[in-house]
């Protein structure tokens, strides 16, 4: 395992167009909003969405579906959703109307320091924080899958991870988006023989329909399914990863792996025109940025504006919120 394309997996709800249609509300108007009669799954890839629905049909709950969807995305979206990264999960339990945010963000190695990506002259080493072993953080997604299954799911990991294991073993077909991302990262992939052998076709961007097969990833998912946290973070697989990262200039240690832990946090809550929105809290910036945008827009009657003015107000609110994020967060 000597590829270090760091992939960060995020479960994201994008609330940009029609906030009213996606929010819980504490007002009497709640009955007017449409709700899915059973379940709705949205993901970045049809195979992941189909898998989530299949898990629900097998008796799984929403958390089991989230595990399965995350794992399949880790297989079919290696450019953005791999298990080598981290993510956030926003959970709601109907029984007690409680919310929790799982913080499974990847973590910097304990030996990381502020000058890690500077040379002896104090200059930034180009690409060092993006490519290579020194750029890799301690993965959080495997721990998140285990945490979800142990604390919230109805099904066991061997069942929820089985579809992803199958796609990793048997392969999935390259689509146009995969081609675009492979083109974007072509140089980095070509410079790593292991990555090139898996994600490229004879060293070049694969043709449409080319099967990407990831047998080592399948084995890793099988280890997680069988042995949970210890299988990935404490035993032989962890030792192999640490050894390989250090061989290629990284600073991982077994302590980094063994001390990783998912954190349960209180989510960010904002009231917008009588509706309660629950979003991700720190260390994600999403909830705070969304809150700032909506608090600015709450001062205006967007429905009374013409389309051009409404878009202008929304864009300016977003621009200011993201400026604040860049400066203060």
Predicted features by range, described:
Residues 18-19:
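N-terminal signal peptide c-region/cleavage motif recognized by signal peptidases
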């Amino acid at each position: 395992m000597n590829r270090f394309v760091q992939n960060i997996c995020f479960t994201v709800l994008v609330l940009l167009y029609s906030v009213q249609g996606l929010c819980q509300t504490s007002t009497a108007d709640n009955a007017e909003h449409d709700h899915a009669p059973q379940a709705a799954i949205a993901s970045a890839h049809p195979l992941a969405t189909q898998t989530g629905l299949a898990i629900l049909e097998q008796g799984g709950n929403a958390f089991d579906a989230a595990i399965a969807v995350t794992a399949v995305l880790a297989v079919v979206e290696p450019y953005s959703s791999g298990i080598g990264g981290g993510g956030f999960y926003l959970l709601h339990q109907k029984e007690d109307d409680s919310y929790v945010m799982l913080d499974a963000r990847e973590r910097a190695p304990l030996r990381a320091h502020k000058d890690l990506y500077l040379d002896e002259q104090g200059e930034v080493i180009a690409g060092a924080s993006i490519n290579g072993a020194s750029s890799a953080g301690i993965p959080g997604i495997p721990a998140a899958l285990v945490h979800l299954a142990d604390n919230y799911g109805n099904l066991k990991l061997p069942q929820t991870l089985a579809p992803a294991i199958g796609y990793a073993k048997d392969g999935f077909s390259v689509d146009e988006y995969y081609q675009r991302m492979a083109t974007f990262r072509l140089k980095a992939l070509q410079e790593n023989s292991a990555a090139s052998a898996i994600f490229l076709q004879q060293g070049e961007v694969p043709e449409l329909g080319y099967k990407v097969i990831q047998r080592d990833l399948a084995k890793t998912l099988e280890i997680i399914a069988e042995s949970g946290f210890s299988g990935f973070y404490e035993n032989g697989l962890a030792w192999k990863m640490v050894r390989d990262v250090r061989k290629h200039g990284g600073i991982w240690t077994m302590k980094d792996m063994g001390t990783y832990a998912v954190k349960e946090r209180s989510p960010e809550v904002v009231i917008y025109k009588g509706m309660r929105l629950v979003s991700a809290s720190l260390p994600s910036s999403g909830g705070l940025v969304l809150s700032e945008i909506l608090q600015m827009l709450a001062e205006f009657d967007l429905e009374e504006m013409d389309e051009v003015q409404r878009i202008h107000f929304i864009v300016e609110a977003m621009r200011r919120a993201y400026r604040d994020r860049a400066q203060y967060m």
